[in-house]
């Protein structure tokens, strides 16, 4: 991550479906020089001006999450607005499996290594994608003024921690099944998907718990 994005986003609507309990909208968020961010916005019929926005970042992809009604039924009942997105390299933009040899222990080895070699680690690029989603929340008429809570699992965890440290528009973060300190990589170097969240030299300056401590919001 080298600097914060300075180009404005462009919001492109790509679909709309009316369901019994909610309205579903599809968007592509475009920012010059960056990958498009595909996302799905779900507005429950019970939503109101005080409804929080839950930004869901699922390593398995937003489509897989939405394929199980039980995953979001409670949110609909409680009137919570759901924003689901696939950050670059996952979900809609997952690299074909044949490009990654299993011996490297990383589901996105090609993308992760190329990103490091060009000086833009994939984790930092995903932080930019999260900032793009926050810009969307600030600009779209359905989302302006609503608090934003981020739920991130797996590979997305460290990117969510960095975004929460950098952007006060995030009210809180909940992380599951993810790394919360890079020291784990040193203590147990044989882990899956380490390259996805490596920032070379970062431990000379900070670790993920430092960002959690310095963020003036709940991150757990």
Feature locations, PLM:
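Non-catalytic accessory segments flanking enzyme active sites
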Residues: 1-43, 112
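Generic alpha-helical hydrophobic packing signal
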Residues: 24, 41-44, 81-83, 160-166
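Generic recognition of stable, solvent-exposed alpha-helical segments in well-folded globular domains
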Residues: 24, 52, 67, 125-132, ...
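Generic beta-strand/beta-sheet core signal
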Residues: 30-32, 40-44, 56-58, 85, ...
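Short, solvent-exposed amphipathic alpha-helical segments in soluble enzyme
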Residues: 43-45, 70-74, 165-169
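Cap/lid segment of the alpha/beta-hydrolase catalytic domain
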Residues: 48-140, 145, 180-193
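Primarily recognizes the serine-hydrolase "nucleophile elbow" in alpha/beta-hydrolase
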Residues: 133-206, 210-214
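Leucine-rich solenoid repeat scaffolds
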Residues: 215-220
């Amino acid at each position: 991550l080298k600097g914060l994005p300075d180009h404005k986003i462009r919001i492109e609507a790509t679909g709309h479906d009316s369901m019994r309990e909610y309205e579903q909208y599809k968007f592509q968020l475009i920012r010059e020089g960056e990958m498009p961010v595909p996302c799905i916005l779900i507005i429950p019929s019970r939503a109101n001006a005080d409804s929080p926005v839950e930004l869901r970042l699922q390593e398995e992809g937003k489509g897989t999450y939405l394929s199980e009604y039980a995953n979001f039924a409670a949110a609909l009942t409680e009137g919570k607005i759901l924003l689901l997105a696939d950050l670059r390299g996952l979900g809609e933009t997952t690299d074909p499996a044949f490009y990654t040899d299993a011996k490297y222990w990383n589901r996105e080895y090609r993308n992760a290594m190329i990103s490091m070699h060009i000086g833009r680690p994939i984790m930092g690029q995903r932080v930019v994608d999260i900032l793009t989603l926050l810009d969307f929340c600030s600009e779209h008429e359905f989302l302006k003024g609503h608090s934003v809570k981020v739920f991130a699992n797996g590979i997305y965890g460290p990117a969510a921690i960095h975004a929460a440290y950098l952007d006060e528009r995030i009210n809180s973060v909940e992380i599951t099944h993810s790394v919360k300190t890079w020291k784990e990589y040193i203590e147990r170097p044989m882990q899956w998907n380490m390259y996805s969240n490596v920032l070379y030299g970062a431990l000379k300056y900070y670790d993920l718990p430092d960002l959690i401590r310095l963020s003036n919001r709940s991150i757990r």
